Amino acid sequence: MTNFEKRVFEAVKLIPKGKVTTYGAIACFLGLPKGARAVGNALHKNPTPIIIPCHRVVNAKGMLAKAFVFGGEGVQESFLLADGIPVNNGIVNLTEHGWYFENLKQTKD
């Protein structure tokens, strides 16, 4: 596991139950504003999805991941529903359920 992947996983652990964040928000939090795709790639290597809740990460429009690594979009939706996050046609309302690392210090290597 790379240092970057470890940092992504630690960031994802910060997302509270009942909230989601975006790949881009994680990348910005880690100091890589153009690193959304790298965040997604790291999440595909999540060794412990129960501990590292990657189902709480959606795209910038609130859309679920069609290639959600732990069973596809339907599984991600069921995990989000279990967290109390409604999903409408594969989209989470980011205005209501978005969480963006406000008031947290950026992590460093």
What function would you assign to each model-found segment?
Residues M1-D109:
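Nucleic acid-binding interface residues in structured DNA/RNA-binding domains
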